[in-house]
């Protein structure tokens, strides 16, 4: 093999909106409410190996807006990307998939959610930036805690070992 074939390689093959749904169970009456809605946001990241060097990473977002006890809208979206990742050491692969890939995808998710909310007739809601490194580290700590509670060795996704 040549040196070029052994070089670390990272490429975005595709970014796409995998799924999106919007519900407005209390429309049109909710538009007459004068109170400001409370907004809850949930974000999750999942990754799947599609082939030896190909990964699908999905950033899911759920935004729920309520006025008093009535749901104004509920939007769920999944922004996905297919990434070609080669010649990356195992200890660097999981952080790349769990931090860098979601960081690339999140602006697309945020834009799609904001657009859908506006098109649904509501004032725009712009999701704040997310520190995917902190989210990743939190997940590793949870995995470590679960493994410790089960009496298993420390482990992280993709088989990397935590120190």
UniProtKB/Swiss-Prot annotation:
| Gene3D superfamilies named in the record | SecB-like (3.10.420.10)
Task: List, in alphabetical order, the GO biological process terms annotated in this UniProt record.
Answer: protein folding; protein tetramerization; protein transport
Q: What is its main location?
A: cytoplasm
Q: Name one GO molecular function term.
A: unfolded protein binding
What keywords were assigned to this record? Answer: Chaperone, Cytoplasm, Protein transport, Translocation, Transport
Cited NCBIfam families: PRK05751.1-3, PRK05751.1-5, secB
Q: What is this protein called?
A: Protein-export protein SecB
Q: Which organism is it from?
A: Burkholderia ambifaria (strain MC40-6)
Q: What gene name is listed for this protein?
A: secB
């Amino acid at each position: 093999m040549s040196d070029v074939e052994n070089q670390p390689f990272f490429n975005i093959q595709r970014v796409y909106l995998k799924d999106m749904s919007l519900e407005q169970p209390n429309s049109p009456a909710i538009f007459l409410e004068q109170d400001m809605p409370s907004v809850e946001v949930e974000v999750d990241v999942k990754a799947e190996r599609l082939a030896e060097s190909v990964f699908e990473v999905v950033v899911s977002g759920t935004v729920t807006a309520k006025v008093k006890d009535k749901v104004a809208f509920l939007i769920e979206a999944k922004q996905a990307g297919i990434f070609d990742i080669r010649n990356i050491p195992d200890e660097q692969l999981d952080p790349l998939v769990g931090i860098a890939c979601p960081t690339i995808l999140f602006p697309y998710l945020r834009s799609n959610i904001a657009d859908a909310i506006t098109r649904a007739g509501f004032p725009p809601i712009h999701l704040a930036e997310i520190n995917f490194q902190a989210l990743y580290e939190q997940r590793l700590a949870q995995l470590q805690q679960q493994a410790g509670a089960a009496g298993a060795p420390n482990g992280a996704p993709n088989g990397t070992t935590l120190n």
